[in-house]
């Protein structure tokens, strides 16, 4: 799995949003100006190799599925879908209603046929999942767009969407924890940072007394 990628939102479409820019919406690496960087923030879908790793990590492409070179057209298509899904999800959370052009584009992507799945035997004789007919960009986009449509039209899941409380983190996730008490995208990352920051504040307060 590529460093900085995150697959714990509870929805594939929210995992896609997590590749966008600042930590919690992407990798969070501030570096110079190179390909894949926007305003000094690393884009989690910086190139075809990054997109390939995301597709596998998100479970959209079964392990061992041969993936050819994913060109700039793939990257641009997924970035565009990410932007539109993010626009729609945040509009719903803010209660401002859908942005019609973004909605039309997501609906158009969702209307395409998703890739077919079949069971084949591997070299050990076990049945494994495989995509039938190869991996096509439109099919991959349709899978993510359909997940977004399902989320946007499900009041129950919409009510579970939370934004990470970590400082500088904008990741969105479904809070399915007991009592709906989840505060961070990751207890090990943002949660641990918050605990460390809290400890440092206490130390400074004690030192100042």
Residue ranges and their predicted role:
Residues 175-182:
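Short linker/helix segments within small regulatory modules
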Residues 188-206:
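Basic DNA-binding region of bZIP-type proteins
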Residues 161-166, 182, 187, 193:
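Residues immediately within or flanking Cys/His clusters that coordinate Zn2+
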Residues 1-163, 170, 207-209:
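Short helix-coil boundary/hinge micro-motifs
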Residues 155, 176, 191:
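Residue-level signal for short amphipathic helical patches enriched in basic/charged
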């Amino acid at each position: 799995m590529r460093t900085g990628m995150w697959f714990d939102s509870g929805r594939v479409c929210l995992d896609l949003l997590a590749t966008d820019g600042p930590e919690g919406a992407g990798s969070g690496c501030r570096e110079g100006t190179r390909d894949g960087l926007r305003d000094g923030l690393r884009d989690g879908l910086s190139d075809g190799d990054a997109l390939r790793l995301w597709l596998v990590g998100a479970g959209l492409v079964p392990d061992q599925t041969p993936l050819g070179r994913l060109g700039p057209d793939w990257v641009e298509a997924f970035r565009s879908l990410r932007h539109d899904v993010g626009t729609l999800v945040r509009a719903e959370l803010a209660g401002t209603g859908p942005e019609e052009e973004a909605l039309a584009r997501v609906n158009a992507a969702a209307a395409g046929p998703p890739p077919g799945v079949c069971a084949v035997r591997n070299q050990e004789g076990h049945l494994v999942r495989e995509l039938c007919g190869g991996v096509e960009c439109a099919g991959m986009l349709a899978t993510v767009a359909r997940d977004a449509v399902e989320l946007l039209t499900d009041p129950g899941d919409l009510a579970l969407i939370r934004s990470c409380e970590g400082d500088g983190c904008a990741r969105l996730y479904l809070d399915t924890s007991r009592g709906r008490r989840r505060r961070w995208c990751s207890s090990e990352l943002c949660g641990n940072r918050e605990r460390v920051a809290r400890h440092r504040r206490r130390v400074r307060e004690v030192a100042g007394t």
